[in-house]
């Protein structure tokens, strides 16, 4: 699964996930893309599960790009531990997603195959998505 090799700080504040995605909001590498239409967080497990479903469906054809990376640590305290005594340990990693963010891109397959592969992948993700096509080469 995806996670940073090293970070400047082990734990981060919760923060807010507002606004629209101003970067990575167009199909840049492939021919077709899966674009987020809502705010949310994608865990490393969700990103990997969706990647597997895409690559299993397209088999050996096509090339895929993952446009998101889980770089935010989410902490959790152990079960039955009283409140206080500091922040919990890092449990998993997430990528924060804004509307308009491109999540996956693919090329080298027909539109029908790409559409079905992204439909299967979208079922594994916790944000609503839409299928987009590259407009300008």
UniProtKB/Swiss-Prot annotation:
Keywords, A to Z, come to:
Ribonucleoprotein, Ribosomal protein, RNA-binding, rRNA-binding, tRNA-binding
Q: May I have one GO cellular component term?
A: cytosolic large ribosomal subunit
What the record says about family reads:
Belongs to the universal ribosomal protein uL16 family.
One GO biological process term is: translation
Transmembrane: present as a keyword of the record?
A: no
Does the UniProt entry include the keyword Ribonucleoprotein? yes
> What is annotated about its quaternary structure and interactions?
Part of the 50S ribosomal subunit.
Q: What is this protein called?
A: Large ribosomal subunit protein uL16
Quote the SUPFAM superfamilies the UniProt record gives. Ribosomal protein L16p/L10e
Q: Which gene encodes it?
A: rplP
InterPro entries noted in UniProt: Ribosomal_uL16, Ribosomal_uL16_bact-type, Ribosomal_uL16_CS, Ribosomal_uL16_dom, Ribosomal_uL16_sf
Q: Which GO terms describe its molecular function?
A: rRNA binding; structural constituent of ribosome; tRNA binding
Could you tell me what this protein does? Binds 23S rRNA and is also seen to make contacts with the A and possibly P site tRNAs.
Classification via NCBIfam families:
rplP_bact
User: Which residue windows are transmembrane per the record?
Assistant: none
Superkingdom of the source? Bacteria
């Amino acid at each position: 699964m995806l996670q940073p090799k090293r970070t400047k700080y082990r734990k981060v504040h919760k923060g807010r996930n507002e606004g629209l995605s101003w970067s990575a909001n167009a199909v840049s590498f492939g021919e077709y893309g899966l674009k987020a239409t809502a705010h949310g967080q994608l865990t490393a497990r969700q990103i990997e599960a969706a990647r597997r479903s895409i690559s299993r469906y397209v088999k050996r054809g096509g090339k895929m790009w993952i446009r998101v990376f889980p770089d935010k640590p989410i902490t959790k305290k152990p079960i039955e531990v009283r409140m206080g005594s500091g922040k919990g340990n890092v449990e998993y990693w997430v990528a924060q997603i804004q509307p308009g963010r491109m999540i996956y891109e693919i090329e080298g397959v027909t539109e029908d195959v790409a559409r079905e592969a992204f439909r299967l992948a979208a079922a594994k993700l916790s944000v609503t998505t839409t299928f987009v096509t590259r407009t300008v080469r």
